[in-house]
């Protein structure tokens, strides 16, 4: 049976709507009928066919990894799922036999493969994933929100790596993940949450999500904002979401002694860092990759159930046949999360 899918067909800029064979599930898998997908920054990299994509993405391949769907098939060894369950899923498929997997630190598996990156993705009418990777969506959480659990999980993992209660938090990079991390920080009790960027659209979006201050670093100095907020000792926690070298070095300059930094943004490999700031301030820096399996997922659901409102981050919806408009919107930088509807 042929089904619709968005695929990377050629080693050049673009993504194409095509027909592929419906995937077949194994004994430990679920077959999921996709309802909604969201476009990730990774998908934009794949669309643009940048240096990372050229080294990483096999062609041809169905792409996409942010989704919500309904279980329509269950492998014979699978327990705990029923036909009709609403699910999203962890996009990192882990090996199960390395030291970290066996030690319960699955998110640190050295043999990870990625849905829509190294194996068939979710931009399709149907997806097969290991049942281990599926996460049931509680009633009361909308399909829209469920479809962005993957990037929301990046935000939650980054933000909750350190204690935020009563702390002053600096977030560099107001993309959708940075903005969601800011919302999480406010929700769990941070004092001042300051986010920086140069994109006014995204900074306005951050204001709607409740940040203390959204700072365009082209127009304002971070030091002036700190003074305005009555901060005298620097930020306690930094969440680096941009991958921008000047943003990261500005963060180092403005951290308090003993401050803690989570790094999610991917900088150039040759980025220059003022290590004196790290050493003499006694800073702690933690690299973040993906989501903790599955502690982050349970936290995500609980945060929404406890009143965290992420709906402003979803700014655009398109039918799947209009996928090109969705990608154009994401590439413009004038959007939050963009959702593609498969129904």
UniProtKB/Swiss-Prot annotation:
EC number per UniProt: 1.1.1.103
Binding site for NAD(+): 177, 197, 202, 264-266, 288-289
Named cofactor requirement(s): Zn(2+)
Reactions listed under catalytic activity: L-threonine + NAD(+) = (2S)-2-amino-3-oxobutanoate + NADH + H(+)
Positions of the catalytic residues: 42 (charge relay system), 45 (charge relay system)
The UniProt record lists the keyword Lipid metabolism: no
A biological-process GO annotation: L-threonine catabolic process to glycine
GO CC terms in record: cytoplasm
Biological function: Catalyzes the NAD(+)-dependent oxidation of L-threonine to 2-amino-3-ketobutyrate.
Assembly and interaction partners: Homotetramer.
Name the record gives this protein: L-threonine 3-dehydrogenase
Species of provenance: Aliivibrio fischeri (strain ATCC 700601 / ES114)
């Amino acid at each position: 049976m042929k089904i619709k899918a968005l695929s990377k067909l050629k080693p050049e800029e673009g993504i194409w709507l095509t027909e592929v064979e419906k995937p077949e599930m194994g004994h430990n898998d679920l077959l999921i009928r996709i309802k909604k997908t969201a476009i990730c920054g990774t998908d934009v990299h794949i669309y643009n066919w940048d240096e990372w994509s050229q080294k990483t993405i096999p062609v041809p391949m169905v792409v996409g990894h942010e989704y919500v769907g309904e279980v329509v098939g269950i492998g014979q060894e699978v327990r705990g799922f029923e036909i009709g369950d609403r699910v999203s899923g962890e996009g990192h498929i882990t090996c199960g036999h390395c030291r970290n997997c066996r030690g319960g630190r699955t998110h640190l598996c050295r043999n990870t493969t990625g849905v829509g990156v190294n194996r068939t993705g979710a931009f399709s009418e149907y997806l097969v994933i290991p049942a281990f990777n599926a996460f049931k969506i509680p009633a009361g959480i909308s399909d829209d929100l469920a479809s962005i659990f993957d990037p929301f999980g990046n935000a939650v993992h980054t933000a909750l790596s350190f204690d935020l209660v009563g702390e002053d938090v600096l977030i560099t990079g107001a993309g959708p993940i940075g903005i969601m991390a800011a919302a999480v920080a406010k929700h769990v009790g941070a004092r001042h949450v300051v986010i920086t960027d140069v994109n006014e659209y995204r900074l306005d979006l951050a204001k709607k999500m409740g940040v203390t201050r959204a700072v365009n670093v082209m127009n304002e100095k971070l030091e002036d904002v700190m003074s305005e907020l009555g901060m005298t000792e620097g930020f306690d926690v930094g969440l680096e979401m941009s991958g921008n070298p000047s943003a990261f070095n500005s963060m180092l300059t403005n951290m308090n002694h003993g401050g803690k930094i989570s790094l999610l943004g991917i900088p150039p490999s040759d980025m220059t860092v003022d290590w004196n700031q790290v050493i003499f301030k006694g800073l702690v820096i933690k690299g973040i990759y993906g989501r903790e399996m599955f502690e982050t997922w349970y936290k995500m659901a609980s945060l929404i159930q406890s009143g965290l409102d992420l709906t402003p981050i979803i700014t655009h919806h398109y039918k799947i046949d209009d996928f090109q408009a969705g990608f154009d919107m994401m590439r413009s930088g004038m959007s939050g999360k963009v959702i593609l509807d498969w129904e």
